[in-house]
C-alpha cells in the first residue's frame, strides 16, 4: 500500500486499497462481483478505497493479500486512514459492485459471490459502527468507482447506464 500525495487520480487494483488526503481522487475499475468500499472522514478530508474480491479470509491457510478479503481488508484500510489523521468514529462508507456476473446459469452452479461480498462488507461495517451513506450494489453489470476526496462524492460508471453520483 502506498500513500498518495498531491493532486492525482490514483488507480486502485483488484485485491488492493489506497488511502489519500484531499484533493486526490481514487479510482477502481472492474467491479463485477467484487465490492468497492470507500471510507471517508469528512472533517479531516482523508479516506480510502478498497477493492475486495472475496468475503472471508478464514477459509484460506496462507493469506498473502489481506486486501483481497472484506474481513481483513476493511480493518487494514482503517488503520492506514488513522495514520493520515482520520478518526474511526467519523468514518462513513459508500459501496459499489457486488453484481451477479453470470446471470442465466443454473442456480445450483452460481456461488453468489457478489451477494456474499456485499453482505459481509455490510456486516463488518455495522460491527465497527461505520454508517453506510450510499450503495450501488447488485445487478449484473460491471462498474467503475471514482472517489473524490475533496468533496466526498463517489461517482459510479456502469456499462450501459448514465453516471451516478452517490
Curated annotation (Swiss-Prot):
InterPro entries from the UniProt entry: CheD-like_sf, Chemorcpt_Glu_NH3ase_CheD, Cytotoxic_necrot_fac-like_cat
Enzyme class, broadest EC rank: hydrolase
Substrates-to-products reaction catalysed: L-glutaminyl-[protein] + H2O = L-glutamyl-[protein] + NH4(+)
Entry keyword set: Chemotaxis, Hydrolase
HAMAP family attached to this UniProt entry: CheD (MF_01440)
Known role: Probably deamidates glutamine residues to glutamate on methyl-accepting chemotaxis receptors (MCPs), playing an important role in chemotaxis.
Name of the protein in its database record: Probable chemoreceptor glutamine deamidase CheD
Organism field: Desulforamulus reducens (strain ATCC BAA-1160 / DSM 100696 / MI-1) (Desulfotomaculum reducens)
Gene, per the UniProt record: cheD
